[in-house]
Each structure stands twice: as structure tokens, then as C-alpha cells.
Amino acid sequence: MHARMQPHEDRSRSGMSRSEAMELEDQLEEEERGGNVVVGSSSANANASTAETGKKSAGGSKPKRRRGERIPPSKRIRKAIAYVNKYASGCFGRVERRLVCTRSISRHSNQKLLDFCVECKKHKIKCVGNFPCGRCLKKGLECVIETPPRLLMNKDEISLNLQRLSHMETILSKLMPSMSLDLPSLEAKIAELSESLQTYPDKVLTDIELGSYQQVTLNETQTYYEDAGSNESFVARVHEIICQGREFQVQHKLTNKGNKTFEDILDPADNTVASLIHALPPKDITFYLLMTFWQFSSDNNHFYYNTKLFAAKVHHLFDDPTSFQSKDGGFVCMLLLSMAMGSLFSYIRHPEFLSDENHDRWTYPGSQFYQNAKLLFPKVISESSLETVQSFFLAGMYLSPTLAHEVVYMYFGIAMRAAVANGMHKKSANAQFSGDVAELRKRLFWSVYCMERKIGISLGRPESLVRSEIDIHFPEYRESLDSQNFIASFRTFTLAIKISLLTNKVYDMWYSSLHGKANLKAATIKEIVNEIEAWRQQLSPDLEIQNIGPDSRSYRGIVHLHLAYHIVRIAMGRPFLLHRLRERTMNSKTDEGARLLTDKLISYCYSSALHIVDLLVLLRMHKFLSVYSFMDYHSCHAASFIILVHLLINPSEQTIEQLNTAIDILNFVTDRFPLLKGSTDVITNLRAFAEQSEVYQSRLNATEPAYSTQVPFFPRDADYHNQINLQNLWNDENINASLEALFNDAKGFGFLLPADNFIFPSDDGDM
């Protein structure tokens, strides 16, 4: 056992006298120089150790420190720890060097709590003595002083953090001006966010069942649809749970037969329907107009109704007109609008009608039928049935050749909303009908959707129905429908829908990039161009223009299908054409990558403009060019603009000839329908202005154009759509970077803005 040390007046806080401490220091010094000092050993051992130490000292080691010489504090403490750990660990416990306080503890009463050892701090008593303290030394406890780590930061780091805090405060003040930046407000906001980010079990969310609510209210022509978020759907789910699976029927408030309906309040008598039936033309004239409509319009990539059933109902109307009452107002409205549509195309059978001197060119054919149909619009809207969709679809198609764009947009909007109200855009809503009825509803919806988007695009309006909400498939072949003579070809109709969706995709791409909603890259353009050309490859040989004759029933519809293909190509390349025109006008330069991409897509666009003119020349030659067709006139109008801009960029005699051909077609239409003369004058005035400019004259006299514009006239080869090879276009690594200037130039996308005199044509219809 270690002998207890006697008290001494000169003992330090460690319990050693000054002489004993000096002796301990001498022993540690000897041990450091290689000596073997053992406390409590015999004198013999001590002498032997001294002799051995003397030998090492004689060998050239450091001289022995003189008594009283002061050792640096850090060295003294380190040596004391080594001695305690080696010789006195049984009494004090082992001392950890990493926890040692490297300075003497103050004896003043106001010493910091940080300098207290763990045991003294635990018992809340004063820590007295050096290290180890007196209490730990007396009780044989391990004396540990916890020293928290200190974060050392230089001035640069502090300055950087202050700048970051200043910037963050500026951002917060801009984004959240109502929030105060004082400490209590920030702490309250953190608590609020922490509470909102709490995690909850997901099982309750997966157990919630939401379903759409669909009910047939009257018959196959009128349905009532509401999605899962509606009040009726919620009531239906509650009723289902209460009834515990038993059958139940929730009737819509407007179909309750026990009370007077809202429709009865609006139209208490059927005098209007009866008077309009009485004012119909004779049966032979009625069917003549209907047959004209079905032959020249209904087969052109649209579907309106089942013509076989419609014709049977018209026969019944003339045989027994008294059987039709106010509830048949939708059918009578459809009949009047169909006759108005037939009036637009009646001159195709008798073209001399438009050349008659007694013909008033300012009269719109079928306007009286249209005015009579408008009398039934309030009743048709209130029914919200399938006939509502068909009636306003026909009304929009009838006015689409005119410049009443806002009215047409409203008509198609009503048709679209009626289709959504009837659930025609949902697969589950159509599943309860028979195969033919479900297919007819599907075809009608796609026709309305494509035309509504076409008019919306031309006016710069957003989508009325988001594409992701539509889950019905494309039309499917049914022999019972497609074998009929007056039902649109299944293949042509499906292809028209697909090219219409591609046109929407192209316009959405440019519109999103203009408003910074998409990071447009050359890869995106490549993808869409490939989709367009993949659609072109789907056309079978019997749908090629050179393989069909003008006597074919579907000739006009197939020509419109090809017009749709070239329209979407024009939409793809027109921004690059405007960009090149601005470059030439301002004498600016572009890098090689941008020039390559621009040249290719200008050729892509310009080639399609020439093809559109060729197709319209064919229609005019075979007397199928319609004066009152939206597609015929506005596709020619769009192609004329492309050729005109191309003429300003690369003037040539060939381009002038092509532009004159397009303007001749426009004049042919406006001479017989003067309401469109304003749109034609825009082209002719721009042509006259361009021909008078000095830049135009100087480029016209140039020997070489900026790039090749040699595109053959019709008839073209079967693979003419592949003549513009774009495969090598996308290999240039600099293309993506060079597009930035083009996409940041908002003026280059002026074609997206509404224009009274320029409506970009659709791709899916006959009107």
C-alpha cells in the first residue's frame, strides 16, 4: 500500500511538498533521458540505476537539469500525467490526457463553471486544487474536466457567412414580404413548417375509395356525368355506404319526372319546333342538301352523327310531322344545320350557280337554315345531351369559313363542354353503351376536340380540356359502321386525329418556350420531326394522291389529310423562317450550328408550302376547290405567307411564279366570297411592298441564292416527303447552344399571337 503522506506546511494542492515535487521532477527527467527510476526501491537498485544512467549520460546525452530550473508548464503537466498513470493509477484512477485542462484553475470565488470537474459540478461544490482536484484526489475518483470544442473561424469565413445571411434576408423579404425577420417570427415560422412536415401513415390514403359518377338519365342520347370531386358523387358514395351495397338510384334534379323541369319553365310550349318543321323545304330538296353535305363534307375526316339512323328519322319526320314535339328540338336543330352545311357545297355539283349574274356574292349560302336553327339554341343548351354536342359542332363548322372567329370559338366551346358533361371523354362513361353507340360517341368527341383545339390555336387560346383528362382510345373499326356509304373512312379519320394531336404538340412546344416554361433543345425538335415523318409513313398506297382519282368518294378527304401533314410541317419550321428574315433585314450573323439548323427547317417548311399550293391546284382543276371551306382557303393563305417570306430571303423567278399561283387561288375564292377579301389583300399588299424594296431587287439580280430552293412541282415522287434529309442535322454538337438566341427572341414567335387577317389552318377537317 502506498504510505499516507504526512501533512506539511509547504504542501501544494497535489498533496506533495516542494522538495518531493522537485524530487519527482528529477526522476521524470532521468526517466526521459533513459533512466529507470522506481519509487520505493532499495538503495542497491537505486545505485544500479544511477550507475546505468551515468553510463548513458557519459555517452553524450543531455546534461542533467539543475535543481530549481523551471520546466515549461505544458511539459510539467505532461510528465506529471505520465508519472501518475505509471506509478499511481491504483490510487487516482487513470487520467485521460485529452480531457486535461491545460491551465491552472483559478482560486478566486468567481471562477467559471466551465473549469469545474465533472464530480464537483455534479455535487454542486467548489472545485479546489490543481489537477486532479482535492476532492477527487481524496476520494480516489477519476478527475475529468469537460472542455467543449471550440469552433475557430477566420475573418474571411465570418465575412462570407455574413454576406450569405444578408442575401438570404433580401430574398426572404422579396418572396415573403409579410413575414418579419426578427428572431421570434423566424422561430414561429420554423415551428409551423415543422408541424406541416410531420409524417402520417399512408394506409389511410390508400383505403380511401373515389369513383366517378355516371348515370343515364333519359336515353342513349343524353347522359349525366360528374367526376369524383362533385357533390353528386359524394352523395352517391354516402348513399352506397348507408344502403350497404343494395341497389339504389340517385336521380339528377333536372330529370325528376314528378315535378316541372327547368326546361319546361324556359320553353313551356312546342310552338317553335312545330313552326320550324312546317317551314322546311320539300322532302326532295331536303335530302338533296343532306346528300350533298354527307358526300362533300361529312367524309372529310370528321364525324357528326350516324347518317343511316339520321336519314330514317328525317323520313319519319316528313311522314308524320305531328309526332315531333318540343323534346325533339335537338334533332330539328341538327337537321337545319345539316341543310345549311349542304348549301355551302351545293355549288360543287352545279358550279355555274356561282357564275350567275343574278347571284348575290354577299349572301352566305344556307343562312336562313342557320337563322332558324338559332331559335332552338336555348332549348338545345338546356338539354345538355348528345344532340347539344352535335348541334353546336355543326354550327361551328358552318361559320368556320367566315371571319366570325369569336363566335366559332364559342360554338366549339359549348360543344366541348357538353361532351364533357356527358362523359364522352371517359372510358368508363362509354362502357355502359352498346358497341356501336360507344364508338359513335368516341368518334364525335375526337372530332369536336380536334376542331376546338384548331380554333383555339388560331386565336392563341389555352386548352379547354387538358389532354391528360382524356382516357378514351382512338376510333376502332366496326363493320356495322364503316361499311356504310356515308360514314367517314376509319383509317382516314384516325390518321386525321393523330396529325391533329401532333399539330397541338408543335404549338405547345413553341408556346412553352416563348414563356420560359420549357427548356427547348434541338433534341426536342428532332423528336417531333421524327413523329411527323413516322405519321407520314403510316399512309398506305391507296391513300397516296397519285394512286386515287377525282371520281373517288374520298378524294377530297384524302387531299385534306395530306394538307394536314404539310400544315404541321409549316408550323414546325415557320419560326426559323421569321428568324432568318430578321437576320437578313438587320444584317446580323449567326454561328455555323444555328445556320445549319435554320436552313434545314426553312427548306422543310418551304417544301410543304409548295406542296399545299400543288394540292389546291389539283382540287381547283377537278372542281373540288371549295369557296366556303376553312381548310381550303386558310391552308392556301398560310402557304402564301411562307412563299412570300421565302421570296424576301431568296428572291427568284421561280418563287415569284409559285407565289402568283397561290394568290390566284386566293383571288378565286374571294371573287366568289368577298367577305374574305381582307385576308387576301394582306398577301397582295405585302407582295407589292416587297417587290418595290431595294433589297429585294438587289437579291433578285444575284447570281446565286443563299441556299438551294430547287423543289420540283407536282406530280412528285411517292417518297417526296423524304427529300429533305434531316438525319445528319442533329449530329452538330453546337446546335443546342446556338438555339439560345433564337428562342430568346420573342419577336420570332409573333405567329402565336391572334391576328384578324391570318388564322393558321387546322389539320383535321374539311372546313
Swiss-Prot record:
Alphabetic keyword roster: DNA-binding, Membrane, Metal-binding, Nucleus, Transcription, Transcription regulation, Transmembrane, Transmembrane helix, Zinc
Residues annotated as transmembrane: 328-348, 601-621, 629-649
Skewed-composition ranges (Basic residues): 62-75
Membrane topology summary: Multi-pass membrane protein
DNA-binding region: 117-143
Composition-biased stretches (Low complexity): 35-49
Location in the cell: Nucleus membrane
Bias-annotated ranges (Acidic residues): 22-32
Protein name: Uncharacterized transcriptional regulatory protein C417.09c
Species: Schizosaccharomyces pombe (strain 972 / ATCC 24843) (Fission yeast)
Organism phylogeny: Eukaryota, Fungi, Dikarya, Ascomycota, Taphrinomycotina
